[in-house]
UniProtKB/Swiss-Prot annotation:
Superkingdom to which the source organism belongs: Eukaryota
GO CC, any one term: chloroplast
Localization in the cell: Plastid, Chloroplast
First-listed, main subcellular location of the protein, grouped into a coarse class: plastid
Keyword list, A-Z: Chloroplast, Plastid, Ribonucleoprotein, Ribosomal protein
GO molecular function: structural constituent of ribosome
SUPFAM superfamilies per UniProt: Ribosomal protein S16
Protein name, entry field: Small ribosomal subunit protein bS16c
Database matches in Gene3D superfamilies: 3.30.1320.10
Pfam families, sorted: Ribosomal_S16
């Protein structure tokens, strides 16, 4: 099963999260199937590759609660 979840990147005290499609059994920072966006909580910036997100959702991927909320704010789910 595939999930859309956050992968931690950046440096100490300056975190950035990538939104990735990843297998459920993989670790948080494990190898992702595809990068579909990023989220910067400090600058409150978000970038989402909407066609890629919709593709994975059509294939049965489940977003985590946080990714769902971020996507909702970015108006991926209308």
């Amino acid at each position: 099963m595939v999930k859309l979840r956050l992968k931690r990147c950046g440096r100490k005290q300056r975190v950035i999260y990538r939104i990735v499609a990843i297998d459920v059994r993989s670790r948080r920072d494990g190898r992702a199937l595809r990068k579909v966006g990023f989220y910067d909580p400090i600058k409150n910036q978000t970038y989402s590759n909407v066609p890629a997100i919709l593709y994975f959702l059509e294939k049965g991927a489940q977003p985590t609660v946080t990714v769902h909320d971020i996507s909702k704010k970015a108006e991926v789910f209308k």
